[in-house]
């Protein structure tokens, strides 16, 4: 018989105040004869926001363990709008069913394919150890406070399936399950399992067909000795799962799992092969890959990522190969870019919403230093905060991106001057410091496509503020009097590696917008670009050659609406498509207008040449624009100029 004190659950659950120690992830709780799901506030709502409660069905609750959550205190309140919240006096405790049949013997022999159904608690070694070449049918029951992995499946051993709950188990690798052989489907509830070396709940060196269930509050038990000898002790990561073998599919919920050291992977660290990952990842944390770190191969990720955090890749860090990310949501992740790619990714089709980079390091949504074939979806409300010049918007590209087919709406950068009088944001410095609130590209070409659809780039801006309080995670807006620059895209002529001490390259970057099958791009925010040091004297600002060309291409049916300035472009080519200038009023009342400019207000000569070919159409909207200043002009192939008079 196990008493509740022996279960080791007093820390996060038993008799704890909700606002203090309830796990940060969503938790399902039974109160009386009803079942509820408790979802924590996301970081952007502030530290004082309340937990949201939703009633769920018995099937969703689906607890098959001999313990249950019990509400104590005054319980639930309802506000005027009908939202249900916990009262401030409410707290939880866990009751263990002491009448349950608790197993005290350790299974350490071949079960000849038979099933095991029992409750295991307090074992000093593996509760179930399947020897080499051993066979077990299905394992069910509950594993609470066992040591040295609750289930050990050895080399060439087989377990047909596991449907059990694992609470507060601990081992060096794989607190709940350590697999060297083959396991069919794994499902259940994994709470508060720990490891020192990685895979706090599941450590896989063999083959697992599917993994499902819930992984809540699994965390590393990293010791002083382990910190001193990480290479010897093989410390990796994986707050819930560390995979070095093969896994067919993972479809589960991961809440508040943590691995703070080495490769990270707050929920999953993959060093093997995973075919598919689905589910929801909430409030997981790691040094890299707040939810997932991939160092080898994943075929498909289709999941939701909320409020995960890391210094590198707040939701996902990829150093291997991911074939496709689709139908995914990255929202309210914080600390760095939601997706960090230093490997290869085929396609990304996702929504990136309100992700926050408050750690002074580059991007808020995607930082690409590898290869991405294509990006589609929506980037909205992503924010980057910085104390210096290293803040560059929703997407930063320092590698290769094949094409982008996406909307960029209301993404922003805030650069703080720390309140010092000598922190001068001159035009030259501003180009390096902020710019590209939607996308910044380092030494790499960019291509945007709109095939039979209308894409928008609007509401993106850079704010040079005077706020003194650095936003560690959630960010604050700059004080009044800050300067707003409505800039969406910035093309840097030098590479990201050269940013600290730039050596400007004689390379013309190419920015392409391709509109076909009636598709269009509407751009309401400015496009800007770096300059190159032609004479290699180290003073690029003295030269007049500019660092990017813009190509507008199509099949004769598309349109690019430029309600913004095209700054510092060398040559703009319109090829079998329409470029239409118009104007746009931003939320702060600023009016932007289509045009070509140097970006300086000192009377410099025009720097941009326009080339029209293959039935190109340049449409000037003369209600606001009566002059276009160009360095050069060429027209051929039945191209025409459209002027409203």
Label every PLM stretch briefly:
Residues 75, 538:
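Acidic, glycine-anchored loop motifs typical of Ca2+
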Residues 12, 41, 142, 146, ...:
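Short, structured coil/turn linkers that connect adjacent secondary-structure elements
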Residues 165, 188-190, 258, 277-281, ...:
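Predominantly extracellular beta-rich ligand-binding scaffolds that present long acidic/polar faces
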Residues 128, 136-139, 143, 151-155, ...:
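Fold-core signature of tandem repeat domains
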Residues 9-21, 32, 50, 70, ...:
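Glycine-rich beta-solenoid repeat tracts in large extracellular/virion proteins
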Residues 26-44, 51-60:
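Extended, beta-strand-rich, solvent-exposed assembly scaffolds of outer structural proteins
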Residues 2-6, 17-20, 31, 79-80, ...:
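All-beta strand scaffolds that present successive hydrophobic residues in beta-strands
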Residues 1, 468-472, 483, 490-498, ...:
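Extracellular beta-strand/loop-rich repeat segments of large surface/secreted proteins
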């Amino acid at each position: 018989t196990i008493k509740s004190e022996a279960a080791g659950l007093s820390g996060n659950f038993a008799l704890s105040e909700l606002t203090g120690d309830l796990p940060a992830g969503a938790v399902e709780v039974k109160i009386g004869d009803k079942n509820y799901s408790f979802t924590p506030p996301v970081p952007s709502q502030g530290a004082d926001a309340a937990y949201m409660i939703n009633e769920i069905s018995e099937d969703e609750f689906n607890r098959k363990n001999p313990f249950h959550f019990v509400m104590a205190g005054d319980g639930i309140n309802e506000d005027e709008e009908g939202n249900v919240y916990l009262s401030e006096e409410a707290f939880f405790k866990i009751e263990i069913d002491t009448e349950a049949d608790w197993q005290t013997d350790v299974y350490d022999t071949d079960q000849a394919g038979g099933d095991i159904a029992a409750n295991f608690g307090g074992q000093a070694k593996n509760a179930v150890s399947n020897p080499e070449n051993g066979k077990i049918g299905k394992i069910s029951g509950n594993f609470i406070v066992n040591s040295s992995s609750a289930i050990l499946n050895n080399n060439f051993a087989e377990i047909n399936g596991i449907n059990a709950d694992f609470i507060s188990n601990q081992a060096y690798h794989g607190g709940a399950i350590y697999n060297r052989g083959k396991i069919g489907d794994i499902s259940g509830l994994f709470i508060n399992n720990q490891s020192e070396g990685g895979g706090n709940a599941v450590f896989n060196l063999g083959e697992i067909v599917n993994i499902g269930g819930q992984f809540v509050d699994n965390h590393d038990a990293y010791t002083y000795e382990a910190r001193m000898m990480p290479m010897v002790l093989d410390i990796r990561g994986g707050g819930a799962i560390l995979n070095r073998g093969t896994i067919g599919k993972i479809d589960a919920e991961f809440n508040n799992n943590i691995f703070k050291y080495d490769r990270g992977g707050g929920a999953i660290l993959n060093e093997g092969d995973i075919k598919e990952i689905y589910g929801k990842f909430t409030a997981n944390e790691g040094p890299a890959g707040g939810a997932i770190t991939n160092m080898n191969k994943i075929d498909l990720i289709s999941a939701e990522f909320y409020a995960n955090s890391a210094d590198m890749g707040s939701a996902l860090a990829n150093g291997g190969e991911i074939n496709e990310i689709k139908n995914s949501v990255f929202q309210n992740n914080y600390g760095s870019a939601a997706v960090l790619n230093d490997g290869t990714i085929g396609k990304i089709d996702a929504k990136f919403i309100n992700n926050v980079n408050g750690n002074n390091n580059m991007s808020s949504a995607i930082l690409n230093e590898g290869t991405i074939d294509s990006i589609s979806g929506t980037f909205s409300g992503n924010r980057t905060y910085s104390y210096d010049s290293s803040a560059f918007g929703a997407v930063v590209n320092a590698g290769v991106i094949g094409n982008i087919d996406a909307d960029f709406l209301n993404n922003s950068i805030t650069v703080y001057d720390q309140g010092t009088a000598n922190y001068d944001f001159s035009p030259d410095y501003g180009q390096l410091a902020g710019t590209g609130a939607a996308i910044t590209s380092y030494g790499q070409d960019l291509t945007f496509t709109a095939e039979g659809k209308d894409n928008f780039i609007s509401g993106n801006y850079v704010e040079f503020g005077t706020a003194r309080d650095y936003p560690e995670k959630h960010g604050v807006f700059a004080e009044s009097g800050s300067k707003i620059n409505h800039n969406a895209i910035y093309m840097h002529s030098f590479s990201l590696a050269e940013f600290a001490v730039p050596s400007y390259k004689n390379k013309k970057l190419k920015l392409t917008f391709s509109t076909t099958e009636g598709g269009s791009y509407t751009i309401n925010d400015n496009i800007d670009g770096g300059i190159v040091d032609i004479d290699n004297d180290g003073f690029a600002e003295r030269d007049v050659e500019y660092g990017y060309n813009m190509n507008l291409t199509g099949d004769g049916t598309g349109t690019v609406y430029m309600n913004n300035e095209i700054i510092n472009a060398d040559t703009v080519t319109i090829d079998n498509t329409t470029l239409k200038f118009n104007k746009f009023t931003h939320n702060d009342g600023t009016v932007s207008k289509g045009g070509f400019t140097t970006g300086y207000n000192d009377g410099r000569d025009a720097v941009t040449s326009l080339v029209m070919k293959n039935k190109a159409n340049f449409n000037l909207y003369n209600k606001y624009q009566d002059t276009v200043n160009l360095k050069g002009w060429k027209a051929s192939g039945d191209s025409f100029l459209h002027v409203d008079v």
